[in-house]
């Protein structure tokens, strides 16, 4: 099920909670959505090897009860994570800001449910509760000031003790403008000690951590250090 205007579907079921004190300050993510609409399936061509994401997705799938409801936050094309979780027998709800990405995810993972939505709308439209969350390279698309709010929102949308697999690129940047596959996107990152603290402060226990040096296939994207955290929601 795809949204039609980037603002979710239906009427909000409840007022925002984790985001209620967030100062939007005229923030506009239309440029982010347009960039990924333009990139489309070239994203998977630029990042063909996703060993870290696949391994972390496998950990998540193994932690879930049978037929669990899982949120894929920033699902992109649905590959590999949404497909991996669906093939493991789980019910996948994927969201992405890009309508083109949502369309590709629907084609790649016909058993999943996908919506064109912003991250904060998961709470606004009460999509949970979820049995688990995958957040691979989605939180880095937010300014640093918003990331703790997004993590607290995920904490509220998860059942107690539920697993979360997430990844970020290690970098000390905030809302940094980056050329990316012929477009420009804005990204944020942390050095790993600060990232761990931000995640813990949002109410998560970190159960495991892996890092990978990654060189994308496209010369338009610089090499990066990818950090994968395996987490669990604390009460």
What are these regions (language model features)?
Residues 187-203:
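Short alpha-helix
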Residues 148-160:
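A short glycine-rich, Lys/Arg-flanked "PGG" loop and its adjoining helix->strand segment in the class I
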């Amino acid at each position: 099920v795809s949204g039609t205007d980037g603002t979710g579907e239906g009427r909000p079921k409840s007022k925002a909670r984790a985001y209620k004190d967030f100062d939007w300050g005229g923030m506009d993510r239309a440029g982010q959505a347009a960039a990924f609409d333009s990139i489309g399936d070239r994203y998977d061509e630029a990042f063909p090897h996703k060993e870290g994401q696949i391994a972390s997705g496998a950990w998540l799938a193994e932690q879930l009860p049978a037929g669990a409801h899982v949120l894929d936050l920033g699902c992109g094309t649905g590959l590999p994570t949404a497909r991996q979780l669906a093939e493991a027998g789980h019910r996948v709800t994927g969201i992405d800001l890009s309508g083109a990405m949502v369309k590709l995810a629907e084609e790649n993972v016909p058993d999943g449910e996908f919506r064109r939505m912003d991250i904060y709308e998961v709470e606004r439209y009460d999509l949970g509760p979820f049995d688990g969350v995958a957040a691979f390279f989605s939180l880095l698309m937010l300014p640093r000031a918003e990331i703790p709010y997004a993590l607290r929102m995920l904490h509220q949308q998860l059942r107690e003790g539920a697993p979360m697999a997430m990844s970020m690129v290690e970098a000390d940047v905030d809302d940094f403008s980056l050329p990316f596959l012929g477009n420009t996107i804005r990204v944020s990152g942390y050095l790993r000690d600060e990232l761990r603290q931000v995640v813990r402060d949002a109410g998560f226990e970190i159960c495991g951590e892996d890092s990978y040096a990654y060189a994308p296939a496209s010369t338009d994207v610089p090499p990066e250090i990818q950090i994968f955290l395996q987490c669990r929601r604390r009460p």
